[in-house]
A protein has these predicted regions:
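Bacterial N-terminal signal peptides that target proteins for export
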Residues: 1-3
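C-terminal motif of bacterial Sec signal peptides marking the signal peptidase cleavage site
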Residues: 10-13
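Pro/Thr/Ser/Gly-rich low-complexity, intrinsically disordered linker/stalk tracts
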Residues: 15-57, 110, 125-139
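Acidic surface patches and DE-rich sequence motifs
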Residues: 122
Length: 139
């Protein structure tokens, strides 16, 4: 009888295990239309914000930099670095429409290929998935 009971308990406790996940956390919507253009001597990023209330949200902008010429592997995985962590009220962001935002990256150099991703985070630090990748070759 003890063997049967142990077997039942063992079988019921088996199953797919996963990391704990709080179902009540509301993650911000990920950006899916990130784009990059050359504007003057800078690269301007643009995207649509899907959240209606941005007062408590923060933005993280990530950038990867590769030399266009040389021995860098363009198809290799990229290393992205945080270049800005901003609130949506920051003067470095420009609203061009009700949900359209732009950011000017002035820290670019000629002869490099730049790749960008962004994430939107709530006040608790819970972030959306990374956006699509926007790339720009800076002359």
């Amino acid at each position: 009888m003890t063997t049967v009971f142990s077997l039942v308990v063992f079988c019921l406790s088996c199953g797919k295990k996963a990391d704990p996940h709080c179902s009540y956390i509301s993650y911000p919507a990920a950006v899916s239309d990130l784009n990059a253009i050359i504007k003057g001597g800078n690269i301007e990023l643009g995207w649509t914000v899907k959240e209606k209330d941005t007062d408590s949200l923060r933005l993280r902008i990530l950038r990867s930099e590769l030399e266009k010429e040389g021995d860098n592997c363009i198809s290799c995985p990229r290393r992205y670095f945080l270049i800005a962590k901003l609130s949506f009220r920051d003067s470095k962001l420009r609203w061009t429409g009700e949900h359209q935002v732009t950011y000017l990256d002035a820290g670019v150099r000629g002869g490099y290929l730049y790749s960008y991703k962004i994430m939107i985070c709530n006040a608790s630090g819970d972030c959306s998935d990374e956006s699509n990748v926007a790339e720009m070759k800076f002359p």
